[in-house]
Amino acid sequence: MLLAIDMGNTQTAMGLFDGDELVQSWRMPTDRSYTADEIHVRLMGFFKMYGLSLDAVDAIAFAGVVPQLSREWHAVADRIAADAIVIGPQTAAVTKLRAARPQAVGADRVANAVAAETFYGAPAIVVDFGTATNIDVIDEDGYYIGGAIAPGIRISMDALAARAAKLASVPLEAPEHAIGRDTEECIKVGAVVGAAAMAEGLVARMKRELGREDATVIATGGLAGIVADSTDAFDMVDGQLTIKGICEIYRRMQKLGVKQGHKPSTPDATAPQTFAKPIPQN
């Protein structure tokens, strides 16, 4: 089985795949202080809770934005005798990239682009509501061409509470109205409906620039469900899009016969890693 890992700045999403089938998924906080011991214990707890065996995992594929945790995850893979594959923009099996600096495209965005094209077709626009709100565009030929990055909803709310003396933290949930009736509801409107309106506006502009009003729009990320209640801009909400993309990249690597392996003693904790040849750029 494959354990797909999406290491975000705030949460780490995991999915266990048997072939192409997603058997189980879960999330845990991303803590940069975690050691391999702590990660291993947490994994064993999740697997036990769902009646699964960690021994069944023969490969772990990573896509993440927290490189300092890569060494610890490699050590966990070593303990359970699983291959460790680091997904990145230059991994041989990923979707085609036409970004100005392909090597700088985040691994999570690459995975989202692969999943969007594979499961929903091209052209497509992915809106990922996480620590940051990422919008990624795949053109009609299946190329990732760029997008946008904005502060995430939680970051915005935390900054507001920290810098505005009379505005406290409020629960993150979709408001019932677009006009807030009190201070707490006004903050929710600004955060959630504001994020929805931003997505609507950017998606509309991107569709026009792309010249394809029919581009499929997919929302994903931990907060996608909350925002989706406040807009009709999304054709699909898929909270598992990133880990499905990681699985698809791993599957393609297997088909291509790309040699995989883990090197727990040597990974550079300051830079993304790949174990495959880069895609030739046109």
Segments and roles (model prediction):
Residues L2-A4, T30, S156-N282:
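ATP-binding/phosphotransfer module of carbohydrate and carboxylate kinases, centering on a glycine-rich
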Residues Y50-V105, D141-G147, G152, R181-V192, ...:
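Short beta-strand-loop/turn "lid" adjacent to the catalytic site in phosphate-handling enzymes
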Residues A93-A124, C247-K255:
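Conserved phosphate-binding catalytic cores of ATP/NTP-utilizing and phosphoryl-transfer enzymes
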Residues L43-D58, L202-D214:
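Phosphate/pyrophosphate-binding loops at sites that engage ATP/ADP/AMP, CoA/4′-phosphopantetheine
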Residues T12-L16, V126, T133-I138:
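Short beta-strand scaffold segments in enzyme catalytic cores
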Residues L2-D6, A59-A61, A124-D128, I218:
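Short glycine-aspartate micro-motif
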Residues L2-K48, G142-A168, A174-H177, E185:
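Short glycine-rich, Thr/Ser-proximal phosphate-binding strand/loop in the N-terminal lobe
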